[in-house]
A protein has these predicted regions:
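Short beta-strand segments
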Residues: 79-80, 103-107, 136-137, 164-168, ...
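Conformationally flexible catalytic loops at phosphate/diphosphate-handling active centers
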Residues: 162-255
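Short helix-loop-beta junction
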Residues: 41-46, 278-292, 341-342
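Redox- and metal-dependent alpha/beta enzyme cores, enriched for Fe-S-associated oxidoreductases
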Residues: 259-288, 301-308
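Conserved thiamine diphosphate
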Residues: 118-162, 166-169, 345-359
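Peripheral docking tails and interdomain loops at the edges
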Residues: 320-396
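Glycine-/acidic-rich phosphate or pyrophosphate-binding loops and their flanking alpha/beta elements
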Residues: 8-13, 241-264, 277
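Thiamine diphosphate
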Residues: 1-126, 131-132, 148, 390-395
Length: 396
């Protein structure tokens, strides 16, 4: 029987970590993820977990400690945000390239500079090619659920890759919502004990690893890493199926909200999906066939599945909470459009950059995007495909 609680996203994440009871947690505080290791350290002090909690002097050291723990055959977790993730950047590639299934709770925040402590997705998108599996969470419940599923995905012998669970800073991390927790024993059974077949620092299987990997082998090693990322798709669905049987909550690569008969749709991630659902409901009451595709699994990107879900539409808008500053489109937009192109599907698609630095995005603004899509669907004219939503113009 599930346990009804009222928790913030950070509290929910810390509770998930407590129930997982990893061997090692190494962390350095940074807003807005600070509360996760703070709450978890209380669990350690109270004897509710037997985790080795390592309070380090920087985020670089936090990831380094997790790498050392996983290399020694231990289950390791951490949490960070924004420039903390940036400081880990070097070690993120070492973690994935060494095939270490570390789990990271990433509370999304704008990357400096200028300094901003509020939410956008510039931190996550800055490491989208670092070889980490990336799951995004609309609300506190999903942040909790994704963390519970994370180890079973990352530690699968056909995957063995690190995984980050993303949630929106402050919007999700500090907002208190009703949430259904799973009983401790059920989580323990679901997550299981970490017993890797092989690990790098096994004294019974001594090897040299890490110092040098040149032309003779690196290409093949990176190919195997890419294959593991592709393998993760199947594993993510298998783990989600087990999770649904335990909780009744269903997860996939994405969520389709009133998309089956839709003519126009928005694609987005994280908490903005909740705002968009409210707009879709309102438009449906007006007789407008609007829908939503909420991406949950961003890495690996579900190319074929996203394309199939969007192929029947007359117009699509992709909302990005960061800007690539490349003149060609923001990250989610380029993934969606390249997916459709490679599958020979041509749906008029436009990009909206929104919410930079935590700027609120209102239902009125989301409704204006659907209004634009109606015009595109009617005329076939995309106009400027690279747009900004909620941007103040000079003098405003």
């Amino acid at each position: 029987m599930s346990i009804r609680e009222r928790l913030s996203g950070n509290e929910a994440s810390a509770v998930a970590m407590k129930q997982i009871n990893p061997d090692v947690v190494a962390a350095f505080p940074i807003t807005p993820s600070t509360e996760i290791p703070q709450y978890f350290s209380t669990f350690v002090s109270n004897g509710q977990v037997d985790t080795e909690f390592v309070a380090v002097e920087s985020e670089h050291s936090a990831m380094s400690a997790c790498i050392g723990a996983e290399a020694a055959g231990s289950r390791a977790m951490t949490a960070t945000s924004s420039n903390g993730l940036s400081f880990m950047w070097e070690m993120l590639y070492i973690a994935s390239g060494s095939r270490l299934p570390i789990v990271l709770s990433l509370v999304n925040r704008a990357v400096s500079g200028p300094l901003n402590i509020h939410n956008d997705h510039s931190d996550a998108m800055g490491v989208r090619d670092a070889g980490w599996i990336m799951l995004f969470s609309e609300n506190n419940q999903e942040a909790y659920d994704n963390l519970i599923m994370a180890h079973q995905i990352a530690e699968n012998k056909n995957v063995m890759l690190p995984l980050m669970v993303c949630q929106d800073g402050f919007i999700t991390s500090h907002s208190i919502e009703n949430i259904e927790l799973i009983e401790d024993e059920k989580v323990k059974e679901f997550v299981g004990k970490y017993q890797p077949e092989h690990y790098l620092l096994n004294h019974n299987e001594p090897i040299a690893v890490g110092p040098m990997d040149l032309q003779a082998f690196l290409f093949e090693h990176k190919y195997q890493q890419a294959e593991a990322m592709r393998n993760a798709k199947k594993v993510i669905l298998e783990v989600a199926d087990r999770f649904e049987k335990m909780t009744g909550r269903k997860y996939g690569f994405f969520e389709e909200y009133k998309l089956d008969d839709a003519e126009i749709a928005i694609v987005c991630m994280n908490s903005t999906a909740g705002t968009t659902k409210a707009v879709v409901d309102d438009l449906r009451n007006q007789g407008i066939k609007a829908g939503l595709l909420k991406i949950r699994m961003f890495r690996p990107f579900p190319v074929e599945e996203v394309t199939k879900a969007l192929s029947h539409l007359k117009a699509v808008a992709v909302l990005d909470k960061t800007d690539s500053v490349n003149g060609a489109g923001a990250p989610l937009f380029t993934d969606v459009t390249s997916s459709m192109y490679t599958q020979n599907v041509h749906v008029p698609t436009v990009n909206y950059v929104y919410g930079i630095g935590g700027r609120d995005t209102t239902t009125k603004e989301i409704a204006s995007v659907y209004k634009d899509l109606e015009k595109i669907a009617e005329t076939g004219d995309i106009g400027n495909p690279y747009r900004y939503l909620g941007l103040r113009r000079r003098g405003e």
